[in-house]
């Protein structure tokens, strides 16, 4: 499977997982300027900006270990632009959904810099 196809498959798996948990996905692969956010969802009146990381196996590390501080900062900047655009007044949160092969996704909530 090609790199991009793996990413798409990982995001689809993350969406299904989050929807089962009661999240409403409102955006996928949102691009603003040079920034991109994999998923934006609303859960319990909180807007969640979600980075999805997929790895076929953990041989070189867990997927969540590949979310860098630089990446989180770029997501935060992009989220600020989105929040302004949609005039969101509620709570926000930054999450990571890590997927390894066929295992259940790992959902890390409220990830900080």
From Swiss-Prot:
InterPro entries: Restrct_endonuc-II-like (IPR011335), tRNA_endonuc-like_dom_sf (IPR011856), UPF0102_YraN-like (IPR003509). It comes from the Bacteria. GO terms for molecular function: nucleic acid binding. Pfam families: UPF0102. Signal peptide: none annotated. Belongs to the UPF0102 family. NCBIfam families: PRK12497.1-3, YraN family protein. This is UPF0102 protein CHU_0465. It comes from Cytophaga hutchinsonii (strain ATCC 33406 / DSM 1761 / CIP 103989 / NBRC 15051 / NCIMB 9469 / D465).
């Amino acid at each position: 499977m090609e790199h991009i196809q793996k990413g798409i498959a990982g995001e689809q798996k993350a969406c299904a997982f989050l929807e089962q948990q009661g999240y409403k996905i409102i955006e996928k692969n949102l691009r603003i300027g040079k920034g991109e956010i994999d998923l934006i969802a609303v859960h319990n009146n909180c807007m969640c900006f979600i980075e999805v990381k997929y790895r076929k196996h953990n041989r070189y590390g867990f997927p969540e270990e590949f979310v860098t501080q630089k990446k989180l900062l770029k997501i935060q900047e992009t989220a600020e632009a989105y929040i302004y655009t949609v005039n969101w007044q509620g709570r926000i949160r930054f999450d990571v959904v890590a997927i390894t092969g066929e295992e259940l996704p790992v959902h890390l909530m409220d990830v900080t810099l």
